[in-house]
């Protein structure tokens, strides 16, 4: 595959297949996709706020003639707001997600994120870190729309004559991650199973599921692989994500067995080549999730504390 420049905007990757890219691929700067055939259109994910989503939909309409009200289906690859907060901008669309993602969306509405951001400057280093990474987004201007159709396992859709396969691979990054595969066009939209040139963040785990999800992507033999964040990639990019996951699992396990705390382990792990990836401080969340996995602890993490640790590691 010829390398596609990582520039903001819409790129046609195949016949009626488009990726919308948002550099730099860091916190909140996610990718989306459009699949169009025979007068039907499916949108893969929306963006972190309504303004960004409307801008994207305008670019898509100008390039393809497919307007917001022409989109019949939105597929959310997972529950995070940077992939869902613009769902309501497509008023006529059915919204499809995994059952697990639908539950997660209901648990953290945008209003809660807006409330946290309103208090962020009073939250010390963790709050300042939140301002630094999320200050560009307007969580008071969102267009939420809950899934109207959910599934587990796999779901096969048709967009015109194109077959679109939804493949559940979570829990991994989140509880309900899915892949969107267009087999005839050898294209897969991976959601946040792939962060390319950025550090993966594991909110859910287990890590083995995420590694297996990467194997599933490889097995699809897609020629165009659109990640949730970062530039369009190929199998090499998928394997590098696997390398990272295996490495941090190995390194976190050593420190867990040695009795180090999450904080000490996150500071102690040397990232080597992976240190050049953006947002390397996400090691804090990854170690926390791995430690809870090792301990069989299913309780929710202290998210504010984790953002504080990421702020500390960022310095």
Predicted regions and their residues:
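Metallo-beta-lactamase
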Residues: 40-42, 46-51, 156, 163-254
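Conserved beta-strand hairpin/beta-sheet module of binuclear metal-dependent hydrolase folds
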Residues: 11-62, 178-191
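Acidic/histidine-rich helix-loop elements
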Residues: 20-28, 107-117, 197-207
């Amino acid at each position: 595959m010829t390398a596609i420049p990582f520039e903001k905007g819409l790129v046609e990757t195949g016949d009626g297949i488009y990726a919308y890219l948002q550099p730099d691929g860091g916190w909140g700067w996610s990718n989306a996709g459009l699949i169009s055939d025979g007068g039907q259109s499916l949108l893969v994910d929306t963006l972190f706020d309504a303004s960004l989503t409307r801008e994207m939909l305008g670019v898509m309409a100008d390039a393809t003639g497919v307007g917001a009200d022409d989109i019949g289906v939105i597929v959310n690859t997972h529950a995070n707001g940077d992939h869902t907060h613009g769902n309501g901008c497509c008023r006529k669309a059915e919204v499809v997600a995994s059952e697990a993602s639908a539950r997660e969306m209901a648990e953290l509405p945008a209003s809660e994120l807006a409330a946290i951001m309103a208090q962020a400057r009073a939250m010390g280093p963790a709050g300042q870190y939140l301002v630094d990474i999320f200050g560009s987004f307007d969580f008071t201007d969102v267009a939420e729309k809950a899934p109207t159709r959910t599934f587990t396992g796999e779901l096969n859709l048709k967009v015109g004559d194109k077959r679109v396969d939804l493949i559940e691979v979570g829990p991994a990054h989140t509880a309900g991650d899915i892949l969107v595969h267009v087999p005839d066009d050898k294209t897969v939209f991976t959601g946040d199973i792939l962060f390319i040139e950025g550090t993966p963040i594991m909110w859910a785990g287990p890590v083995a599921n995420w590694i297996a999800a990467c194997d599933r992507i490889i097995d699809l033999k897609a020629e165009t692989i659109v990640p949730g964040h970062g530039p369009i990639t190929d199998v090499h990019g998928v394997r590098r994500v696997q390398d990272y996951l295996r490495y941090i699992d190995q390194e976190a396990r050593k420190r867990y067995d040695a009795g180090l705390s999450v904080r000490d382990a996150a500071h102690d792990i040397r990232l080597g080549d992976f240190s050049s990836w953006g947002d390397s401080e996400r090691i804090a969340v990854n170690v926390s999730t791995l430690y809870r996995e090792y301990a069989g602890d299913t309780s929710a993490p202290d998210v504010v504390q984790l953002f504080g640790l990421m702020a500390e590691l960022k310095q």
